[in-house]
């Protein structure tokens, strides 16, 4: 059976509080999230937009590891940790061991191609030698040849961020950006980093994206209307994805 379009759901670990976070994650999976990205607050959130930065501030000081263990017991879909390599590069082996110990499936470092491109092959090897997935983040500023290369080594999917930071608009259309890379990518192409409106989603899917990654809009919805309302958004996005086979 052909797999439908993928819904990748992001949430900052522990946001807005531990219980609400758990409720949202479980509800998201029950309503169609295929993969979870859990954000580990970094020291400097260079490539995150204001909404996600604010969510990091709200959970500062939280002991994330027991929380990850709890979530892992509750859901069966793949879970990827999302955090900055800059914070862990000097203790990468130890960090990856912790990721493995709490039974996460892999890691996504948004700064890998931007700030550590010379170490790409080495870091990819270290991650995979631990038995973890390395999900690679790329963007319109990455050269075509590099997008093509990393699409072949990225695990699960290639994450293509269409905006310079999460939730910040850009002048070029989503369709144009995806048309440029679709033929370069030998992998599942997941589009995110600022998708929020229904028209953005539909544009991405009709241009050939294999799925979407959404986070900012869920954080905003939890802030405004609570967890149940954010779970309803997951359900809504799942229904849109299911229109495209």
Swiss-Prot record:
CDD domains: Tryptophan_synthase_alpha (cd04724). Pathway: Amino-acid biosynthesis; L-tryptophan biosynthesis; L-tryptophan from chorismate: step 5/5. Keywords: Amino-acid biosynthesis, Aromatic amino acid biosynthesis, Lyase, Tryptophan biosynthesis. GO terms for molecular function: tryptophan synthase activity. It catalyses: (1S,2R)-1-C-(indol-3-yl)glycerol 3-phosphate + L-serine = D-glyceraldehyde 3-phosphate + L-tryptophan + H2O. Its EC number is 4.2.1.20. One of its GO terms (cellular component) is cytosol. One of its GO terms (biological process) is L-tryptophan biosynthetic process. This is Tryptophan synthase alpha chain. It comes from Saccharolobus solfataricus (strain ATCC 35092 / DSM 1617 / JCM 11322 / P2) (Sulfolobus solfataricus). The lineage of its organism: Archaea, Thermoproteota, Thermoprotei, Sulfolobales, Sulfolobaceae.
């Amino acid at each position: 059976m052909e797999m439908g379009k993928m819904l990748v759901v992001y949430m900052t670990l522990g946001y807005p509080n531990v219980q609400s976070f758990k409720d949202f994650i479980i509800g998201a999976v029950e309503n169609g999230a295929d993969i979870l990205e859990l954000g580990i607050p970094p020291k400097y959130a260079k490539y995150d937009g204001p909404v996600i930065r604010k969510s990091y501030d709200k959970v500062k000081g939280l002991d994330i590891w027991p929380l990850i263990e709890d979530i892992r017991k509750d859901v069966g879909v793949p879970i990827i940790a999302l955090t900055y390599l800059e914070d862990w590069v000097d203790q990468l082996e130890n960090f990856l061991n912790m990721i493995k110990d709490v039974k996460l499936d892999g890691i996504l470092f948004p700064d890998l191609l931007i700030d550590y491109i010379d170490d790409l092959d080495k870091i990819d090897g270290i991650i995979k030698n631990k038995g973890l997935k390395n999900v690679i983040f790329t963007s319109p500023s990455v050269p075509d040849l590099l997008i093509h290369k990393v699409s072949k080594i990225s695990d699960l999917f290639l994450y293509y961020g269409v905006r310079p930071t999460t939730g910040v608009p850009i002048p070029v259309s989503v369709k144009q950006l995806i048309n440029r890379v679709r033929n370069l990518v030998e992998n599942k192409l997941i589009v995110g980093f600022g998708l929020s409106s229904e028209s953005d989603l539909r544009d991405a899917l009709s241009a050939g994206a294999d799925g979407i990654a959404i986070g900012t809009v869920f954080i905003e919805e939890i802030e405004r209307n609570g967890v149940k309302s954010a779970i309803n958004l997951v359900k809504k996005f799942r229904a849109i994805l299911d229109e495209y086979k």
